[in-house]
Design a protein with these regions (language model features):
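Outer-membrane beta-barrel translocator domains and adjoining extracellular loop/strand segments
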Residues: 211-212, 276-282, 351-368, 401, ...
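Membrane-proximal, glycine/serine-rich, low-complexity loop/turn segments characteristic
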Residues: 22-23, 63-67, 87, 94-98, ...
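Structural motif
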Residues: 29-40
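Short, acidic Ser/Thr/Gly-rich low-complexity loop/linker segments typical of extracellular
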Residues: 50-65
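Face-selective signature of the C-terminal outer-membrane beta-barrel domain
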Residues: 330-348, 377-415, 419-564, 587, ...
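A short, solvent-exposed loop/turn motif at the edges and junctions
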Residues: 47-53, 75-91
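Conserved C-terminal beta-signal and adjacent last beta-strands/turns
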Residues: 735-756, 766-870
Length: 870
């Protein structure tokens, strides 16, 4: 009996072994055809060809992968891939093949003649959620590429984001503020296929404890990632090289966004003209205003800067060698507490060549100067910070310790009217700490804030002329502190608060110069300024129905202690400054609101201009200060209207601002031999400014695109003393821009942008008017030849008026092609400045000057590169 049992057991084991041996595992990855992003939740059925009978089934994971085991012979069977909102796909199976990847396409579901699609914008209260997939295209790489296509969102050349004309006050990733004020690091480096939605938090109050107490008119953005991009390492790698001249580009990003920790690290290097240092720019201004400011910056007494271009894309002229590295980390150390660190370094080396003609308009003559310059700049920046933040409904605490170090070197060879060579060394060092504490108990809130900073600018300038050498040294340093405490009460619908503060400044400046003619005046300075400012700032807010009103009446008392250490002379003074302001907003409906604001202010005294000796700012400009405690008086009034229909992808706003100022000091400019002496003249002058503009953006659902129109106008009336004569002038600037992005066909994307501007200056005392008109156009066309093969043709056209009868035309064209393999590797070939255009020219106006400038462009570049997103 036992023998029979053994035989039976052995037979069953053999059958099981054969069965296991015949088991086959089918694997693969399912992606969206348009964006190559992985699809989760796709049902994968194994079935017989021509039959509805399902043999096996499974679902794809978060990364789009699937596994399906079967012992059924593969021949004669097929895999069926299905997901709501996507076209069902079928693959026939072959013996010996176990890897089956699939690309799926989106498909609308028609139910009783109603097409069901995910909306491109959803609204939940004050939050607008933009569905990234509705705006993205296979040609888009970074999140910034997609943001530019979203109605209501504006992205400037620097990367600054505005929503319906208002700048952001916060930028979050999954609800956490890892990057502080440098959100370019996220928008330019996070791949758009990793992002599910962009949430715009309108009227965002970043301090939770003040959520129902103090209103905010500023928006914030929160990035919501796809599940497949969370809690794992994702990133991109790009490398390329080319010729004419030898060019390279390399980039690597690595990031991970988990529930309790986030990291975003980047490494970039190129010489193709792309300014990757913009990633590190501070884009959110949270330093306050007027004498309540939490910041203080030293003046650059030496100011040697190569000519900068207007209008044209910066990457057309940047002849660079740039390297950057950033390391950004955040850890959740408590339920509502985060610890974040940031380390940034950049090296940017630029060379440039330009020529210019400057006309200085005087009451009785015009002075012309010609410059031909070849410049080389080297800029090294190192920034580091560590921040601890707690944000709850009862407690807000943050402390950020930062350091910002810069080493800026400039060398300029100048030919023309005044040939010379300038060598400037302008390092800058700053260490600062920001502490904020808010405690809320019931209907009241207590705060204590403190900002402290030490900074130093030891600058030098060497000017070599045919007739001699000049050297200027200017060293300034300062300690600045602003601490305040406040108590606020919330008595619905009112909130009243009182802030008390103390500002301390201790600053010194020492300068020496050699080689400057004695006839021009004293060329040495050694001064010190100290002040202790106490201030009180009562504020009241009202919010009820559609009304929001804010009234503020800050008052400060400041004793100043100024000493000229060269002559051991003191000039002390005390001053009271009152700066009332009002803000009013009325929400007519969920779509339409009006805002009105006004202020009367006494501007901050320009105490960094308190010196008597001359300082050589550049090869031609000599600056001298003026010890005067009179402050500029100002008034402003601003009115704006906002309109939006988020579900119809329509956003619009209109604004108008009027401002007036009165000063007892007038800027003075004197021409003496080879120099321009810039100073101040004790004479009361008035100036005023008009600013107005409008913006509108509308999504084009049928064409899967957007159209936007914006226009701005500014008019300034002022005066300037030149050679002891007062000159009145008016400058005007008007521009209008239209942008269109459309997909007329599935395989075609088109972008077009046109800008027209008019700039003019009127010299009232001699009745002379000069103006210039400029037109710029940008166009790009993306053609998907196949699902993986892309062609792109783009161009820029500029028509700039150089004089009354002379216009400069410039056409720049680019061509690129790329091919993306199944696993996401992309090979591309780019040709920039296809026709190898040489120069760009334009005319501009400022401070009774007309400047005609011509700049050398980058030559034709041919670059081959490989890109991979993981």
């Amino acid at each position: 009996m036992r023998t029979h049992q053994r035989y039976i057991t052995l037979t069953l084991l053999c059958i099981l072994a054969l069965q296991l041996h015949a088991q086959i595992t089918l694997t693969g990855v399912v992606r969206l055809q348009r964006t190559r992003q992985p699809l989760s939740g796709v049902i994968v059925n194994l079935k017989q060809e021509g039959s509805k009978r399902i043999l096996k089934f499974t679902r794809t994971q978060a990364d789009g992968s699937y596994k399906l085991q079967t012992s059924t012979p593969l021949a004669g069977n097929e895999l069926q891939f299905s997901l709501i909102g996507y076209a069902t796909e079928i693959l026939s199976l072959s013996e010996g093949q176990t890897q089956y990847d699939m690309m799926m396409t989106e498909k609308s579901i028609e139910l009783r003649e109603v097409i069901v699609k995910a909306p491109s914008i959803r609204q939940r209260g004050d939050t607008l959620a933009y569905n990234v997939a509705s705006f993205a295209d296979i040609n888009d790489k970074s999140l910034a590429d997609v943001l530019k296509k979203m109605p209501g969102i504006e992205v400037s050349e620097s990367g600054e984001i505005k929503h319906n004309g208002k700048p952001l006050n916060k930028f979050y990733i999954e609800g956490r503020d890892m990057l502080g004020n440098r959100y370019n690091l996220a928008t330019t480096n996070i791949h758009q296929t990793d992002v599910a939605s962009v949430e715009v938090l309108q009227n965002h109050q970043p301090i939770k404890a003040l959520d129902d107490m103090s209103f905010s008119e500023s928006p914030a953005i929160n990035i919501r990632l796809k599940e497949a991009a969370k809690s794992r390492l994702v990133g991109t790698i790009k490398a390329g090289g080319g010729i004419s001249p030898n060019v390279w580009e390399s980039e690597a990003t690595l990031m991970r966004f988990a529930k309790k920790a986030q990291l975003l690290n980047t490494l970039k290097s190129n010489n193709i003209g792309t300014d990757v240092t913009r990633d590190n720019m501070v884009l959110i201004d949270d330093i306050g205003s007027s004498f309540l400011s939490r910041n203080y910056a030293l003046k650059n007494y030496i100011n040697v800067i190569p000519d900068r271009l207007m209008d044209i894309s910066e990457n057309r002229v940047r002849k660079n060698q740039t390297h950057t590295i950033s390391m950004n980390n955040l850890w959740g150390v408590g339920k509502n507490t985060d610890l974040s660190t940031q380390l940034l370094y950049s090296h940017d080396r630029l060379v440039s060549a330009s020529c210019s003609q400057t006309s200085y308009f005087l009451n009785d003559s015009t002075i012309l100067t010609n410059e031909n310059q070849k410049a080389k700049t080297r800029q090294n920046k190192l920034s580091a910070s560590i921040a601890l933040n707690t944000n709850t409904s009862r407690l807000y605490f943050t402390n950020t310790l930062s350091t910002d170090l810069q080493w800026n070197d400039t060398d300029i060879d100048m030919a023309g009217t005044y040939p010379n060579r300038q060598t400037a060394r302008q390092p800058s060092y700053k260490v600062h700490d920001k502490f904020e504490l808010l405690r809320r108990t019931g209907k009241q809130a207590f705060t204590f804030n403190s900002y402290n900073a030490y900074m130093s600018n030891p600058h030098t300038l060497l000017v070599q002329r045919p007739d001699g050498t000049q050297q200027q040294n200017a060293r300034s340093q300062a300690f600045f502190s602003n601490s305040s405490t406040s108590l606020g009460y919330y008595l619905k619908p009112f909130m009243v608060s009182m802030k008390l503060g103390l500002v301390v400044l201790s600053r010194s400046m020492k300068s020496t110069a050699d080689g400057i003619p004695d006839s021009l005046g004293l060329v040495h300075n050694h001064v010190g300024m100290t002040y202790l400012r106490t201030y009180v700032s009562p504020k009241a807010e009202f919010k009820s129905g559609g009304w929001q009103v804010r009234l503020a009446l800050p008052v400060s008392y400041t004793p100043y202690f100024f000493k000229d250490k060269l002559v051991q002379a003191s000039n002390n003074h005390h001053k009271v400054i009152v700066s009332p302001s009002v803000y009013l907003q009325y929400q007519f409906s969920s779509k339409f609101k009006m805002s009105l604001s006004g202020s009367i202010s006494q501007n901050e005294i320009r105490e960094q201009n308190f010196y008597n000796g001359l300082i050589l700012s550049d090869y031609r400009n000599l600056n001298t200060g003026f010890v005067n405690y009179d402050s500029e008086q100002g008034k402003s009034l601003s009115l704006s209207f906002d309109y939006k229909q988020p579900l119809n992808t329509l956003f619009a706003n209109v604004y108008i601002t009027r401002s007036w100022s009165e000063s007892t000091l007038t800027t003075s400019r004197r021409f003496i031999d080879d120099y321009i002496l810039n100073s101040y003249f004790a004479r009361k002058t008035h100036s005023n400014t008009w600013m107005t503009g409008a913006r509108m953006s509308k999504g084009l659902n049928l064409l899967r695109g957007m159209i936007s129109v914006s226009t701005d106008y500014m008019s300034f009336n002022g005066a300037l003393v030149q050679n002891d004569n007062l000159s009145h002038y008016q400058s005007n600037l008007w521009s209008i821009t239209t942008k269109v992005n459309i997909h007329p066909l599935k395989w075609l994307e088109m972008n077009y942008e046109i800008t027209y501007s008019n700039e003019s200056m009127t010299f009232k005392d001699i009745d002379i008017r000069s103006s210039s008109n400029n037109l710029s156009q940008r166009f790009s066309c993306n053609l998907n030849i196949t699902k993986a093969w892309l062609l792109k043709l783009s161009g820029e056209h500029y028509s700039n008026q150089l004089s009354d009868n002379t216009h400069k035309q410039l056409l720049l064209t680019d061509f690129s092609t790329s091919y993306t393999f199944v696993h996401g590797v992309e090979l591309s070939l780019n040709v920039r400045n296809l026709f190898n255009q040489k120069t760009y020219a334009y005319t501009s106006y400022t401070d009774l000057m007309q400047i005609r400038q011509e700049y050398e462009l980058r030559p034709r570049n041919i670059l081959a590169s490989v890109f991979f997103h993981f």
